[in-house]
Amino acid sequence: MNLRELQEMYDLAKLTYKEGVRLEVRDKIAELLRPIDVDVFNGTYKAEIFDEDTAMGLSDEEFDKHEEREQAVRDVLRECEGQLYEMVEEIDEWCSVCVSLYSNTTIGIEVEVDEMKFEYEFKNRYSK
């Protein structure tokens, strides 16, 4: 076996490992975000988060109900961030996790593990 063949085998192994980690993290995200109905394959989630346009014209009672739902989503995300960090730490101790509501309609998750960075983005199915 020459050096080039060895390098190709190494590159393939590295790629396979990276893809395996990416899928493992994706599955962990799906598991943790199940309460807000995340679909990791379609990059969507289903939670009634509202924006200012939607909020206008709502009664105080309706507004409060929407606000409670949005807070519930934020609570799930905060809890998910901690749990995801613990799960990913099992793969490699050098990891970081950042879960955020990028806007009223998008959840963004960034995971860095073993010097590999993965970004996952989920769009709200309710958004226009």
Model-derived features with residue positions:
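Short intrinsically disordered terminal tails
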Residues: 1-4, 8, 53-61, 117, ...
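Acidic, low-complexity, intrinsically disordered interaction modules
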Residues: 39-119
